[in-house]
Design a protein with these regions (language model features):
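Conserved hydrophobic beta-strands of the Rossmann-like cofactor-binding core
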Residues: 4-7, 85-86, 138
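The beta1-alpha1 cofactor-binding region of Rossmann-like NAD(H)/NADP(H)-dependent oxidoreductases
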Residues: 36, 58-73
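A glycine-rich helix->loop->beta "capping" turn
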Residues: 50-54, 74-87, 93-98
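Catalytic loop of short-chain dehydrogenase/reductase
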Residues: 90-107, 126-190, 197-212
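C-terminal helical subdomain
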Residues: 195, 212-261, 265, 269
Length: 273
């Protein structure tokens, strides 16, 4: 049976390049996006490029906890096994917006939604690891911007200190801390968790957040996710952070065990777990 991977935000950009490469390599890929129209179009295009590829799709908004719960339920109903979760989707907001759950949009989409999704899918990931006798993977796509981030535990929605970059950097630091916390919570025989900076890549997010900046190709940005998702034997310990494919020490804030525990507790409370 093919190994199964869910790649969030895989209708375009790095996520699509990741999904394409993993499908080409023989994995069953679940394409995810907020729009069903875009998910269906991506699957149709990938099917044309990769005859015989095993593809499925799911659409839900990571910024809505209700939508995340419904999306996770769809996945669990339709997919009996799940071996890899690539938390790739992300945004850079141009203005401060609060979701229906009362959470600042960047934090909701980039961290809290993936946090909730990961926990809802975790039992299936662990079951699949036991059956396959290969550790399942959670891969969080973050950014070098995490080094400029600060976790505002008393104001995670940044009501008093919002800028687009501050919100983005906080969410990317949370991604690194999330992967490290997963590595602490699950034995490596069952789960391997990683975070990675893909490089400065020509994506919609780069243009929205940083203007007309020249970046590398999406295929280049997908390389680390593809390697970590596809390898049967782990090349690096669980919890490792990669920068452009190289295992690297993350920011000091991400290495603070007490801060990671506090973020986990706050995230679980906000997500209703």
């Amino acid at each position: 049976m093919s190994r199964v991977v869910l790649v969030t935000g895989s209708t375009d950009g790095i996520g699509r390049a990741t999904a394409r490469a993993l499908a080409a390599g023989g994995m069953k890929v679940i394409v995810h996006g907020r729009s069903k129209v875009k998910v269906d179009a991506a699957i149709e295009q990938l099917s044309g490029e990769l005859p015989g590829a095993e593809l499925d799709g799911v659409s839900f908004d990571l910024g809505s906890q209700k939508a995340v719960r419904n999306g996770a339920a769809q996945i669990l109903e339709r997919v009996p096994a799940l071996h890899v979760l690539v938390n790739n989707a992300g945004i850079f907001a141009g203005e401060r917006t609060v979701t229906d759950d009362g959470i600042e949009l960047t934090f909701a989409v980039n961290h809290l939604g993936p946090f909730l999704l990961t926990e809802l899918l975790m039992p299936r990931l662990l079951e699949s690891a036991a059956t396959a006798k290969i550790p399942s993977r959670v891969i969080d796509v973050t950014s070098i911007a995490h080094t400029r981030g600060r976790i505002h535990l008393d104001d995670l929605s940044l009501a008093n200190a919002w800028t687009g970059y501050a919100a983005y950097a906080q969410s990317k630091l949370a991604n690194v801390m999330h992967a490290h916390s997963l590595a602490e919570r699950h034995p490596p025989a069952s789960l391997l968790a990683y975070s990675l900076h893909p490089g400065v890549i020509s994506t919609k997010l780069l243009r929205q957040g940083f203007g007309p900046v020249t970046g590398a190709t999406t295929e280049s940005g997908a390389k680390t996710s593809i390697r970590l998702a596809g390898e049967e034997v782990a090349s690096e310990p669980s919890g490792t952070y990669f920068s452009e494919g190289v295992a690297t020490q993350p920011a000091a804030a991400a290495r603070d065990a007490a801060a990671r525990a506090a973020l986990w507790e706050a995230s679980a409370k906000l997500a209703g777990l």
